[in-house]
From Swiss-Prot:
Family (UniProt): Belongs to the G protein gamma family.
Database matches in InterPro entries: G-protein_gamma-like_dom, GGL_sf, Gprotein-gamma
Propeptide residue intervals: 67-69
List of residues that carry Cysteine methyl ester: 66
Lipidation (S-farnesyl cysteine): 66
Protein name per UniProt: Guanine nucleotide-binding protein G(I)/G(S)/G(O) subunit gamma-T2
Membrane topology: Lipid-anchor
Subcellular location field: Cell membrane
GO cellular component: heterotrimeric G-protein complex
PROSITE patterns: G_PROTEIN_GAMMA (PS50058)
One MF annotation (Gene Ontology) recorded for this entry: G-protein beta-subunit binding
Protein's job: Guanine nucleotide-binding proteins (G proteins) are involved as a modulator or transducer in various transmembrane signaling systems. The beta and gamma chains are required for the GTPase activity, for replacement of GDP by GTP, and for G protein-effector interaction.
Pfam family, one: G-gamma
Length: 69
């Protein structure tokens, strides 16, 4: 799609995008970093990658074995 547009059209789209982005509220990383860290630590108990999935609720556990007769 970008190849079909002229350079002027591409620059116009970029300016429009930058106008949208400049309206986004900005915050200091020292504040947001702490908020993210606190959230991750608070939710760590519910994270299946950290605590694992119970065997009875694991959708990827093999249902049965192979029977050869």
């Amino acid at each position: 799609m970008a190849q079909e547009l002229s350079e002027k059209e591409l620059l116009k789209m970029e300016v429009e995008q930058l106008k949208k982005e400049v309206k986004n509220p900005r915050a200091l990383i020292s504040k947001t970093g702490k908020e993210i860290k606190d959230y991750v630590e608070a939710e760590a108990g519910n994270d299946p990658l950290l605590k694992g999935i119970p065997e009875d609720k694991n959708p990827f556990k093999e249902k049965g074995g192979c029977i050869i007769s």
